[in-house]
From Swiss-Prot:
Swiss-Prot/TrEMBL GO biological process terms: DNA integration; DNA recombination; DNA synthesis involved in DNA repair; DNA-templated DNA replication
InterPro entries, per database record: DNA/RNA_pol_sf, HERV-K_env, Integrase-like_N, Integrase_C_dom_sf_retrovir, Integrase_C_retrovir, Integrase_cat-core, Integrase_Zn-bd_dom_N, Rev_trsase/Diguanyl_cyclase
ZnF region ranges: Integrase-type: 587-628
Domains: entry comment: The LPQG and YXDD motifs are catalytically important and conserved among many retroviruses.
Domain Reverse transcriptase: 57-245
Record feature DNA-binding region, as residue ranges: 811-859
Gene Ontology molecular-function annotations: DNA binding; RNA stem-loop binding; RNA-directed DNA polymerase activity; RNA-DNA hybrid ribonuclease activity; zinc ion binding
Lineage: Eukaryota, Metazoa, Chordata, Craniata, Vertebrata
Keyword Mitochondrion listed: no
UniProt family annotation: Belongs to the beta type-B retroviral polymerase family. HERV class-II K(HML-2) pol subfamily.
Chain's gene name: ERVK-10
Protein name: Endogenous retrovirus group K member 10 Pol protein
Enzyme Commission code: 2.7.7.49, 3.1.26.4
Length: 1014
């Protein structure tokens, strides 16, 4: 061997001498001397340092120095009582060019062939046997100080590798590696592991091992290195690199983790670093250490305080238990390795096995780079990572990879997943999904969220479509079959959009297609079902992402989500629907929501004041918790005479609001024409209080012509009558003990109280502290904001302008004269909620009637009278066109047969009459003039195909009530038409001559096929 010849020389006595190894010079970033002052040392440590320095001086490891460089030196006492020298070389290391590690990781003892005998040796003082380059010695000088500076300090410099120097491990590995190279070449069939100064030799037989060891001893000695005789291991159990090695098994050395020293981030960082080092042997999945990893979150200062939580304490106990029981196996060099991937919680777990013997565990980091990492991508990443590990261990790819996927899922992964393609690139082995039958893996906690189950990659057929949007002002919304606006605490459009998507997934328990104009939210929603969510310092974002994942996983029906570009001029329904969702979070809608939160104004008032649609205004009211509860069903309004102009007729009453305390007597006045309300809170209801209230009304509303009250003592007193006569006001009272004569003001009392409750419990009007302030806010809402049914302006506008826009004013009408039981032609003067005022003709007093006694006609007055006089009836037959009934909002169709009783004539068709009539005059079904009259039981109702029910038979019996039965109610959505036509064979067009016009038309030739319409 040439290198051996260079090292060895024959002396004149014939003995072989060993030349010292040639030193490796260091590369320096600067030649400027680095001097760090030596700190004082206690007398005991100073004496120990002198002894150690003399010992090293005698061995030739140090020499006296006059170097301009200096590093502090100190000593520590070991458990054995011996002292050890250490030099603080941090400042010197900063100016040394690093050589880089030659062994970036520990060798795995699992690669030692099973049943092979071993010998383990440790090199004695390895660093001190390797010289420094002569030009580098002065840079490692140190000073031994004198107490009280009574004598000059003693200075030395290192001639050998000092402990703590940046490149000492690399230089040591290089020297030892050179010494072992001849051994590896001669005994290539032996398995030799060398790490720093620890050397392990394994051979197939004991004789070969002894030969290898003998040759190794000589080579080590020739290199100037020495073997520590007290650290030679030749029998089991062997201890090497923290492991206990037996003939076939490998176990971690028994240790106990001290928990009392875990105080700072640095303490936990070191602990988890040590645990991660032995995790491939322990087999602790990532999910089982989540609480320990979570402690590392937060402040990045190494000295920042940390608390060991009870959950983390349990995980440390698990680590200690695993250290006591875990074991892996030495391999058979002739058998291939396999990789098993288990779908464990949090992230997948990999296991390297040989046959059924465990070789090593493989895990992914607890935290990821990406915010969302799909579980399939995690599997692919773990496969790629473990393939590299196996190649590093034995130089080959695994023979087989077992994954928790079916063959079809594997095929789809190769097509659709880039991460999968990278993780399995150039793999020529077998991909299988059959796991070996063994109990050693049964403790793993598996997950089912590997591939998406709820999220779809293609649009769903026959599913609802919902559009979402979010704004940066704390509003999220969606539109589709229904609309909803959600108030959020966030000032981010992306987060509000995320809230909108979460709300849609919660509100619609059926298959849906979601369209969003946020690419970020769309991608997050697509991935979140099976994704590992990266922890963020933003708690709000963590909560949103976790809620999104929980919502998706709890769904029973699939969904599809896609992205649409916002604010484009592209045509089509998708763009329009997205704009509609955008409008829901627009400033007008937000202002409408804010006003409703303050005043609880009704939907008509919101639409009148803001640029919002009817549906948006109604949704605001319907989603208000106070208004939803307080909008109770009301009875059909009766007919109370009303004024035909402002201040023509007032109604006045006193109601009680207990929450007002002493001022609980609330005097209420309402103008029966404009519905303008004024109220004052008083301490009583005597005449003086009534007069005080009326003066307040005059200041706001003006002076009325007539006032109607009940028969209370405050209203019937002479003092009150005198007061009214002074103001030229006539006074009437209702029937004693009958509140129906005061129906308008009684209903106003309820409306006012309801508004007070809304505003009190609504939460946005806390500034109104006194009773009168609360009353004023309610009056402002009712008079100046709310718009009531069949009106287009507020009560205040009607009262101040005298203009009342009745939707049917001036139209011809059929009205029922209850005295004569006849129907007459008249003209509408005004039309209100459940009532109307009709002019019977010239020079006749107007008649107040309930709307159920009114029917419209779209004919000239002459034709109508002629039609009425002849009592003409017109049949509707099968051959006629279907009658279209347009739905204004939603319609509740009565059940097939209501057999409870024949109803009153005026009740016939009541349900349908109230619900329909959007484009045409109201159409009713039943026995009443102007109603469609079925003469038979079976009619066919055709519902458009967009409805979930396409066809059903509508049964009716002549003269029967059309009241609905609860179990037969059917809801039809907004603005859809119902087509009614007779069912059966065609009937003759001509009416039989013997039929009577006033009777139900029944044809013998066609029973079940006709109806009459007046």
């Amino acid at each position: 061997n040439k290198s051996r010849k260079r090292r060895n020389r024959v002396s004149f006595l014939g003995a072989v001498t060993v030349e010292p190894p040639k030193p490796i010079p260091l590369t320096w970033k600067t030649e400027k001397p680095v001097w760090v002052n030596q700190w004082p040392l206690p007398k005991q440590k100073l004496e120990a340092l002198h002894l150690l320095a003399n010992e090293q001086l005698e061995k030739g490891h140090i020499e006296p120095s006059f170097s301009p460089w200096n590093s502090p030196v100190f000593v520590i006492q070991k458990k054995s009582g011996k002292w050890h020298t250490l030099t603080d070389l941090r400042a010197v290391n900063a100016v040394i060019q690093p050589m880089g590690p030659l062994q970036p990781g520990l060798p795995s003892p699992a690669m030692i062939p099973k049943d092979w005998p071993l010998i383990i040796i440790d090199l004695k003082d390895c660093f001190f046997t390797i010289p420094l380059a002569e030009q580098d010695c002065e840079k490692f000088a140190f000073t031994i100080p004198a107490i009280n500076n009574k004598e000059p300090a003693t200075r030395f410099q290192w001639k050998v590798l000092p402990q703590g120097m940046l490149n000492s491990p690399t230089i040591c590995q290089t020297f030892v590696g050179r010494a072992l190279q001849p051994v590896r070449e001669k005994f290539s069939d032996c398995y030799i592991i060398h790490y720093i100064d620890d050397i392990l030799c394994a051979a197939e037989t004991k004789d070969k091992l002894i030969d290898c060891y003998t040759f190794l001893q000589a080579e080590v000695a020739n290199a100037g290195l020495a073997i520590a005789s007290d650290k030679i291991q030749t029998s089991t159990p062997f201890h090497y690199l923290g492991m206990q090695i037996e003939n076939r098994k490998i176990k971690p050395q028994k240790i106990e983790i001290r928990k009392d020293t875990l105080k700072t981030l640095n303490d936990f960082q070191k602990l988890l670093g040590d645990i991660n080092w032995i995790r491939p042997t322990l087999g602790i999945p990532t999910y089982a250490m989540s609480n320990l990893f979570s402690i590392l979150r937060g402040d990045s200062d190494l000295n920042s305080q940390r608390i060991l939580t009870p959950e983390a304490t349990k995980e440390i106990k698990l680590v200690e238990e695993k250290i006591q029981s875990a074991q892996i196996n030495r391999i058979d060099p002739l058998a291939p390795l396999q990789l098993l991937i288990f779908a464990t919680a949090h992230s997948p777990t990999g296991i390297i096995i040989q046959n059924t013997d465990l070789v090593e565990w493989s895990f992914l980091p607890h935290s990821t780079v990406k915010t969302f990492t799909l579980y399939l991508d995690q599997i692919a990443t773990l496969i790629g990572q473990t393939r590299l590990r196996i190649t590093k261990l034995c130089g080959n790819d695994p023979d087989k990879i077992v994954v928790p996927l079916t063959k079809e899922q594997v095929r789809q992964a190769f097509i659709n997943s880039g991460a999968w393609q990278i993780g399995l690139a150039n793999f020529v082995g077998l991909i299988d999904n059959h796991y070996p039958k063994t109990k050693i893996f049964q403790f793993l906690k598996l997950t089912t969220w590997i591939l998406p189950k709820i999220t779809r990659r293609e649009p769903l057929e026959n599913a609802l479509t919902v559009f979402t949007d979010g704004s940066s002002n704390g509003k999220a919304a969606y539109t589709g079959p229904k609309e909803r606006v959600i108030k959020t605490p966030y000032q981010s459009a992306q987060r509000d959009e995320l809230v909108a998507v979460i709300t849609v997934l919660q509100d619609f328990d059926q298959p849906i297609n979601i369209i969003s104009d946020s690419a970020y939210v769309v991608q997050a929603t697509r991935d979140v079902e099976t994704a590992l969510i990266k922890y963020s310092m933003d708690d709000q974002l963590n909560q949103l992402f976790n809620l999104l994942q929980q919502t998706v996983r709890k769904r029973n029906f699939p969904f599809y989500i896609t992205y649409i570009r916002a604010h484009t001029n592209l045509p089509g329904p998708l763009t329009k629907a997205n704009e509609q969702a955008d409008l829901l979070v627009s400033s007008a809608l937000i202002k409408a929501q804010e006003l409703h939160a303050l005043t609880h104004v009704n939907a008509a008032g919101l639409k009148n004041k803001f640029d919002v649609t009817w549906k948006q205004a109604k949704d605001i009211v319907q989603h208000c918790t106070q208004c939803q509860v307080l909008h109770l069903p009301t009875q059909e309004a009766g007919v109370n005479p009303r004024g035909l102009c402002p201040n023509a007729l007032w109604q006045m009453d006193v109601t009680h609001v207990p929450s007002f305390g002493r001022l609980s007597y609330v005097h209420v006045t309402v103008d029966t024409y404009s519905h303008f309300i004024w109220a004052t809170c008083q301490t009583g209801e005597s005449t003086s209080h009534v007069k005080k209230h009326l003066l307040s009304c005059f200041a706001v509303m003006g002076v009325p012509e007539k006032i109607k009250t009940d028969n209370g003592p405050g209203y019937c007193s002479k003092a009150f009558q005198k007061f009214l006569s002074q103001w030229k006001i006539s006074h009437t009272t209702g029937i004693p003990y009958n509140s129906q004569g005061q129906a308008i003001v009684e209903r106003t009392n309820r409306t006012l109280k309801t508004q007070l409750v809304k505003q009190k419990e609504g939460g946005d009007s806390k500034e109104c502290t006194t009773p009168q302030m609360q009353l004023n806010l309610a009056l402002y809402t009712l008079n100046f904001l709310n718009i009531y049914r069949n009106q287009t302006t507020t009560s205040a506008e009607q009262h101040l302008t005298g203009k009342k826009n009745s939707p049917h004013e001036g139209k011809l009408i059929w009205w029922k004269d209850n005295k004569n039981k006849t129907w007459e032609i008249g003209k509408v003067i005004t039309w209100g909620r459940g009532f109307a005022c009709v002019s019977p003709g010239e020079n006749q007093l107007p008649v107040w009637l309930p709307t159920r006694h009114l029917k419209f006609y779209n004919e000239p007055i002459g034709d109508a009278k002629k039609r009425a006089s002849t009592e003409m009836v017109t049949p509707v037959t099968w051959m006629d066109n279907p009658i279209e009934v347009y739905v204004n909002d939603s319609i509740w169709v009565p059940g097939p047969i209501d057999d409870r009783c024949p109803a009153k004539p005026e009740e016939e068709g009541m349900m349908i009459n109230i619900s329909i009539g959007y484009r045409y005059p109201p159409i009713c079904l039943g026995r009443a003039p102007g109603c469609l009259m079925p003469a038979v039981q079976n009619w066919l109702v055709e519902v458009p195909t967009v409805s979930p029910i396409s066809r059903f038979t509508y049964h009716m019996v002549s003269g029967m009530s059309l009241r609905p039965r609860v179990n037969y109610l059917q809801d039809f959505s907004y603005q859809r038409s119902l087509k009614f036509r007779p069912k059966g064979k065609p009937c003759p067009k001509e009416i039989p001559k013997e039929s009577k016009n006033t009777e139900v038309l029944v044809w013998e030739e066609c029973v079940a096929n006709s109806a009459v319409i007046l």
